Amino acid sequence: MNYQPRGISTFQAPASYQGEIDAAQALLETQPTWNGVTAEHVARMRLQNRFRTGLDVARYTAALMRADMAAYDGDPTKYTQSLGCWHGFIAQQKLISVKKHFGKTDRTYLYLSGWMIAALRSEFGPLPDQSMHEKTSVPALIEELYTFLRQADSRELNDIFRSLDKARKEGDKTREKELIEKIDSFQTHVVPVIADIDAGFGNAEATYLLAKKMIEAGACALQIENQVSDEKQCGHQDGKVTVPHDVFLAKIRACRHAFLELGVEDGIVVTRTDSLGAGLTQQIAVSHKPGDIGDQYNSFLDCEEITAENARNGDVIINRNGKMMRPKRLPSNLYQFRPGTGEDRCVLDCITSLQNGADLLWIETEKPHIEQIAKMVDRIRKVVPNAKLAYNNSPSFNWTLNFRWQVYDAMKEAGKDVSKYNRAELMKAEYDDTPLAKEADERIRTFQADSAKRAGIFHHLITLPTYHTAALSTDNLAREYFGEQGMLGYVKNVQRAEIRQGIACVKHQNMAGSDIGDDHKEYFAGEAALKAGGADNTMNQFG
């Protein structure tokens, strides 16, 4: 059983299908009263449920992700990817599709987005990305994701077992051998998840408690951001407030302690800095001597020099190079950073995080621009040479417009004629077939590979793609079905497309586990089993 693609041996899998049968048979021979239990049925059920706990999943996927990180260090073409999934079914279908199209799941991950949990999974209803949703909904979704991925393993193996029984019944030894080899080389649908813990939902202890629950549910990688927990905003909205480094480092250590306590020693901590777009801090950092990390954080504060004579009642005053400085304080009691310091603060954040236990970085940017990211990563790598990023290929960016602007500006700078383009209107469909638009699309197509090579991006993710695909596909179906096309709007654009594209869900009873259940009934009741998959089951219409 290939539960260790790329040579990972942390999670022990059986040597062979026959070996698992032999182990079950040896056990059954010690239990003379277990009548009607067969070794092969036991072996099959064990193979269909190799990951028995979330910690099994976390340990296996952490080792997998560590191997991928090492591979990327040696070859930046080996970057990894994920799509954000807001339900276990979406994750399951993604991995089934990846296996169908590419034959393997290597370097394919899941991303769990706090934004989508807030918008789609909170009992309060749709919420903005401000950490107002129940924090227990995060580990609950992780558990759900892996429940569906494990069921994908069970379903695919069950189909192979049925084919094996058929080959034996027909006496087809060649086919039987092929199917047993397929079982022995089976690659699981279980892949790493990078899970969003926001800003920790409270203090360091609260972060630790939630991290434990997330790891126990199966998370091998926790992504934590340097915003103030109770002022948290989406990374692509205004009003972000960061915390001093000592506050953030305590939360990094809380995540690491949670991993180590639970025996997930390869666990990954992803530290996200929002400093590029955050102009405010809630606290002035504690500094013990000039040049320490607190002093460096405070050096970015927007201050004015004062004297004892013009100090006001209630002023907060800091000593900067022997001068009395008053940080600019807003009516909200927040302090303001100097404009134009975002990149410098990001670089300091990243270096400090990597020197204090972080494994991967996340720099939240306002646009998808390779050189902007690379410029910061170059500075970070002067201090930490193997620094690497997870990067948010965010739907909050207008990708079409951003890349058309980039091409337009490059053409203009190179002295090329741009007179037929209106930069302010480049989103218009009339530009779609122009050389500028085609060049922009090519840059979008190669963005991930190019930035993996140039900007140190190990993992490319889209945070909320399946939020948008759900809306788009539903809009298309509603337009056709409730319009003149009626039932043809569903049949032509959904069911017929599923059949022609080989989408497994066209047999929705099978996908939901009906065949697995039927086979279990046969294991338990033998010939007396009342099964759903008989001649009158309408799923037979789909072959």
What is each residue range found by the language model?
Residues 371, 471-472:
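Extracytoplasmic/secreted cell-surface and envelope-processing proteins
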Residues 2-6:
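Terpene synthase/cyclase
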Residues 492-543:
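C-terminal functional modules
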